[in-house]
From Swiss-Prot:
The modification Phosphoserine is found at S322, S353, S428, S508, S641. It comes from Homo sapiens (Human). It is a multi-pass membrane protein. Residues 545-571, 664-680 have a biased composition (Low complexity). Keywords: Glycoprotein, Membrane, Phosphoprotein, Transmembrane, Transmembrane helix. The gene is PLPPR3. It is found in: Membrane. GO terms for biological process: phospholipid dephosphorylation; phospholipid metabolic process; signal transduction. Residues 313-347, 416-488, 545-577, 664-702 are annotated as: Disordered. One of its GO terms (molecular function) is phosphatidate phosphatase activity. CDD domains: PAP2_wunen. This is Phospholipid phosphatase-related protein type 3. The modification Phosphothreonine is found at T376. Its main location: membrane.
Amino acid sequence: MISTKEKNKIPKDSMTLLPCFYFVELPIVASSIVSLYFLELTDLFKPAKVGFQCYDRTLSMPYVETNEELIPLLMLLSLAFAAPAASIMVAEGMLYCLQSRLWGRAGGPAGAEGSINAGGCNFNSFLRRTVRFVGVHVFGLCATALVTDVIQLATGYHTPFFLTVCKPNYTLLGTSCEVNPYITQDICSGHDIHAILSARKTFPSQHATLSAFAAVYVSMYFNSVISDTTKLLKPILVFAFAIAAGVCGLTQITQYRSHPVDVYAGFLIGAGIAAYLACHAVGNFQAPPAEKPAAPAPAKDALRALTQRGHDSVYQQNKSVSTDELGPPGRLEGAPRPVAREKTSLGSLKRASVDVDLLAPRSPMAKENMVTFSHTLPRASAPSLDDPARRHMTIHVPLDASRSKQLISEWKQKSLEGRGLGLPDDASPGHLRAPAEPMAEEEEEEEDEEEEEEEEEEEDEGPAPPSLYPTVQARPGLGPRVILPPRAGPPPLVHIPEEGAQTGAGLSPKSGAGVRAKWLMMAEKSGAAVANPPRLLQVIAMSKAPGAPGPKAAETASSSSASSDSSQYRSPSDRDSASIVTIDAHAPHHPVVHLSAGGAPWEWKAAGGGAKAEADGGYELGDLARGFRGGAKPPGVSPGSSVSDVDQEEPRFGAVATVNLATGEGLPPLGAADGALGPGSRESTLRRHAGGLGLAEREAEAEAEGYFRKMQARRFPD
């Protein structure tokens, strides 16, 4: 019984099934049958007359009457048609039952075909397959018979019993056979005209062609439909039909109905027709492939396209626009995302552009605090690279005041411990590192040594791997570079000067500690020092200290730093304020400083610093540090100290000013500003407030400037 699921299965509709059957297949088969009638049962078409030899013994074999043959023609047609057709019907019926009960209509060894509605009738798979396979078999039989008859009529070769039924009258020739042995005239005197006509059609043997076609066709059907698990069933059926075909052909030889060559040729013709029809007419008896719906074209991702469009617009912007925010506002409040930077060759270490934007978390009702350092002056040893993707990077920096206190205290303790180690003459400041996880003092010393080794390897191998938090390293002779070590997680980011990288000859790992110790001692002796110079100038001063005063060192200098406090440790008025300081050196000859202050402007030295740097043949970033004038500095402040928190009293939104370091244009009026960390301050936050300049401040600044010049004179005595 057919399951309910299959009964309720909706069949497909076909508009071409019945028209193709009625107007194509049936007319072809009918025309073949009609043609066979005229060729076999009538004398309408006469075979060609071919000459023979006088008294040819190969044509004088005994004649066997048609009714006395072992396999007469009618029996041959019935066997060649009935046996294969019956076998196909039985096999299809069994297959349909097995598919319905065991596998269902969607499975089965021979494939599955669903029902089709055509002309208001439902045709199941059994009916459709049976009609198709049996119909092709009938058409093949007719085609084989037609081909055989046409060849026989065209050739007109004689059968072995031709002279027996012809009974030639040699006296009608007028000459003897000795003179002319080959006879082309019709001198037959026999009374059985039908026998004489049949004796002229022997090549190829009709029994051989029809039997071979039936055997090959049904054997291919068995091989395709019957599974190999049936063991001997399939070989038995195949061999049975092959033997039957062979017997039909051989009987024609034994009864002198055909020559052996006629039988062999008939076998080849019948087998060829069967193989062609089985492969191309019925598709090797397999179910036609189901029509799969065309897969819809993948819809274009609008969000992805919009994101890519935004990235393209940012990366293709003008190189001088370094204060643009590269990340969407919604992503500034989330977890930090990694910055992708592709690894390039050794030339990328000397690239002419580094632009790192450090963005603090967006505060409510205020803009984000951003400090940007940009330097794209061309290098003398390498061409300038204008890849916008390398110029713009956005790093989200979450800060924690408690973590900042701990890191500052650890750094000061290490600086005090390094006082007893001595100060080499060629000592240089260290690099700025962004710690991402708490470490003990012993672990930090080990990491410093490992970082020094890594820096030496990176100079030979290639650029540093990308990461979220940058590391600014001041390398003697090559200028500072930005390294992004792979740090995981969103811990706070505080820039603290540490041990110097051993990048040049004659430098020791302890030189940085000695330099910081001497700075602290000098600051303590100064008494009343300038209060809190900005963190910006500290970074520039440190990056300037180890570099050469020549144009090449000035052109290769670049650094980045940012510090900001968490919004939960600040008052509402402080959280609403914003500050953006940008040093943009995209211009080919003069660097430009963009200043955004919320009411209390930064105070810069007059244009003498820039003019001096220009006169020396290059732009010295250290001049910017020497040109800064700030408020009162408490005791213990050193040029390398971290940034401290002070109260911020600017309006909520500030204006943006542009200062040309080379010409001094656009300099704001002299005022007060603050920056570096004092002993009593522990939070690393960039703050600014107005204040006056005192005599003690200028003396401390003059002493620091003298020390810087003295250090440079010692490093470069020539």
